[in-house]
Amino acid sequence: MSPTPRRSRPVAAATRPRPPRVSALEPRTAAPLATTRRTALARDGEPGAERLGVRKTYKLYIGGQFPRTESGRAYEVFDARGRLLANACRGTRKDIREAVRAARKAFPIWAARTGYNRSQVLYRIAELLEGRRDQFVSELMAAEGCGRRRAARLVDAAIDRWVWYAGWADKFSQVTGTVNPVNGPYFNFSIPEPTGVVGVIAPEESSLLGLVSRLAPVLVSGNAAVVIASESRPLPAVTLTEVLATSDVPGGVVNLVTGLRRELVGHLAGHMDVNALDAFGVDPAAATELEQLATENVKRVARPPAGGLGRYDWLAAAAQSPYLIGQFVETKTAWHPIGA
């Protein structure tokens, strides 16, 4: 009787690769994710290389620092086409208080600077903006839905506006200050001085040029500012604070809070340590309500045009004027006897 022949193992089965063993503690997506990263690293520098995008975190700007809101809340910011751009901090009443406290602390430092020095600092802001021009153009295109040419024009106008107001920093007192004629043996001098802490409600539609047009005249005379950014388009304003942080502006001179306006503007208008309020960025009806809140400590309030800002041209010559500086200065008059 012949022996039974042995069955040979199929060649395909012998050469078939075994699947890798995956530990029960290891996530199923770990291997593909690592592969993707290795591929991206291997192709670094080549066209079309895959990489993970770095999402920017937009924070508040208070006292020269970039803190998160004390509540930890955020809200979604969309571009002009309704696509999600980023999450911005949703500021609270406490954030307004902290911003006002920082502005009050920085005000005497900024007000004590000479007009010539403030002029240099404001010009430095324009220099830094010029270096980041392309970034601001891209942000305006996304935020306001305008074309590249229009966005570039708005950014250039914002840079030029800083330069224009920088030129007034050491001239405003010369133009508006005077020796008054009086009937008596006295000298009588009138000198403009900064008001103090000014609350600025940025225009909702013009996220960069509108903000610069209202903020720059506040800073020229030596005021400190607490700014509530545009609710729907806050990102260019936050990027502007990054420029301010790297410029020579002392920390606390400009403070920016983002969030829902209905939760912020009332607290800013009613704060007893705010000396003036720029309500140019709200509609006339809202400005009237803010004026009523501002009466508690007799704040000076700058109102918007009677018809609102619907068609306001921020590129027009009227959007920059030395008279805008005068909205937030106090005139001090001194008497001095004439010697023999």
Identify the residue ranges that each predicted region occupies.
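N-terminal Rossmann-like NAD(P)+-binding subdomain of aldehyde/semialdehyde dehydrogenases
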Residues: 3, 16-186
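Short acidic active-site motifs
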Residues: 150, 186, 263-264, 286
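C-terminal segments
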Residues: 3-10, 16-41, 49, 160-175, ...
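Short loop/edge segments at beta-strand edges and connector loops
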Residues: 251, 258, 305
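Hydrophobic/aromatic ligand-binding patch that stacks against planar heteroaromatic rings
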Residues: 216-219, 267, 293
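Short catalytic-loop micro-motif centered on adjacent basic/acidic residues
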Residues: 226-229, 252-256, 276-279
